Amino acid sequence: MFNYEELFQTHKTPFYLYDFDKIKQAFLNYKEAFKGRKSLICYALKANSNLSILSLLAHLESGADCVSIGEIQRALKAGIKPYRIVFSGVGKSAFEIEQALKLNILFLNVESFMELKTIETIAQSLGIKARISIRINPNIDAKTHPYISTGLKENKFGVGEKEALEMFLWAKKSAFLEPVSVHFHIGSQLLDLEPIIEASQKVAKIAKSLIALGIDLRFFDVGGGIGVSYENEETIKLYDYAQGILNALQGLDLTIICEPGRSIVAESGELITQVLYEKKAQNKRFVIVDAGMNDFLRPSLYHAKHAIRVITPSKGREISPCDVVGPVCESSDTFLKDAHLPELEPGDKIAIEKVGAYGSSMASQYNSRPKLLELALEDHKIRVIRKREALEDLWRLEEEGLKGV
């Protein structure tokens, strides 16, 4: 059993704590699922881009799915090889495209005809041939939260089949473009395998048509999105996931790329926070803690529910419903409504569970609150992987502006 009391003697709350053994095992589970088939697991940095986490994955020969030049540079700094990096996203700037091409990453996932022509122009100016993939929007309902659904025609992501064909033919004729992959990604936190298989089958059929037209495809990028169990939901079995994709690709000798993020890191992380006060207002019980929505946004943004565990011994205390809330001046600064917790006292510690994905990566300094300390548990030892910001860090980049006042 992990000794939290020793941890609290050294580190003040709130902080993130990650179990690196869980991250390692989650990644290896993907490698095992695709064992025996040409594949590349590109971890999606958007889920959590801490350098120490990336370094751990780099040592396991992970690739990287990046959506900004900042993420690409993070991946490289952590030791992920350029030939294992793919660059996705609907709004790549010309600067980002140029930098990615200079770094010679594996390929860019292209999301519009205008972007394709921009890449071509930049590649021509550099005197190189840009490896590209085209993201196809298969118009399939991923059955997930609308904010993280990306595979329907009303979503901003990818292009339809007809436009994709036109883009591939354009790229084939270009002296500065090299089409090497097809790509789709239908959403995040997916708990139903059927939409993924349906999308794989649909895009595999397109890939066969492209190959028949003389386009030399080498990769089949299925995106990511496998969900985790936040509320005891049944999740997708990775063996079934891999077999479904492999079956869709029968007759195609392509390297499979998948881009998991949440399912690699979510279950590894806890947000450790302490009780500041308890209050009752009009028969409503509130537990006020020292972490806020700026530290962990998912409950406020997505109405996501994360289990809360009391760390401080509380045997014998009366249990009753309460809302666990933070100090930020928003009514949405709520971690969990109607949580059944024992009576809590100032200084008691609680853990918000499964926050390793889209926790620290979505954090902000809202209300001028410094970003949190991040710790790793590895080989039964604790180490700091991100220092807590100091108050002075909040305005450090603004001080120059005061000189002219």
From Swiss-Prot:
Its EC number is 4.1.1.20. Pyridoxal 5'-phosphate binds at residues 225, 259-262, 358. Coiled coil: none annotated. The keyword NAD does not apply. Pfam families: Orn_Arg_deC_N, Orn_DAP_Arg_deC. Changing residue 148 to G: Nearly no change in substrate affinity and 235-fold decrease in catalytic activity. Specifically catalyzes the decarboxylation of meso-diaminopimelate (meso-DAP) to L-lysine. This is Diaminopimelate decarboxylase. It comes from Helicobacter pylori (Campylobacter pylori). The gene is lysA.
